[in-house]
């Protein structure tokens, strides 16, 4: 009770953290991010610290549930991988915040096998890569990849209408744009040689731009942390010879392997990839 004095007796090396407020917390915790690893694992992150360990996944059996040390994140492993493009609904059962408020709202994510939205290793002409119903539709991190050979300027490489875009700028550099934020490379890519251009939107809202495996630029917009990319057709521009979009934010090492014959190594989601800062 606020204003009341309490005495706490601690054992040697014991630590207790107390939260005190002059207002009662009656707000239920909510799932603010739900992701898949493209295989059998779901990652569910709440908007505050919670207790409990029971979930229901609609039309699926759960193999295991593990809570992370941050007390906000759960890793749910399913007995079998969902069908490609199936909607996976997660329903909290006994999840409560530190004030005892119970989580009641479910959350859903569209499952894509191996996190692939679209993947085309041999683009022969400019045009549509994926129709709107098969496009990215999420507030999670994602990765856009293109192999390009061009001498042009101010040309689109990969875009999902006005939702995001990889392009060649008027100066011949690479750029990656999402919701008002643009990362630009220092390196020119319109030299008639082949270049691998990758844009990554991380879960904290940071945009990163890689050219030929090297980080070339970044940009940040706090509103992009939970900015939702809406459905629209995905298209490739002139000079693009390979293209892909993934519903996961790949890290530096994974980006370096994009487009290689041996393909991407299996990526394991970690807390570092989903624990984000407000600033």
Predicted regions and their residues:
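Short, aromatic/His-centered strand-loop micro-motif at the edge of beta-sheets
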Residues: 175-196
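Short, surface-exposed alpha-helix to beta-strand junction/turn motifs within ectodomains of secreted
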Residues: 37-67, 90-96, 107-110
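Flexible glycan-contacting loops in extracellular carbohydrate-active proteins
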Residues: 215-241, 267
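Acidic, Ser/Thr/Gly/Pro-rich low-complexity segments and short DxT(G/T)-type signature motifs
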Residues: 23-33, 91-121
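C-terminal beta-strand-rich structural cap/linker in extracellular carbohydrate-active enzymes
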Residues: 2-25
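Extracellular glycan-recognition modules
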Residues: 117-121, 125-175, 201, 206, ...
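Surface-exposed, short loops/turns at beta-strand junctions within beta-sandwich domains
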Residues: 79-87
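Short tryptophan-centered beta-strand motifs in secreted/extracellular beta-sheet-rich domains
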Residues: 193-202, 209
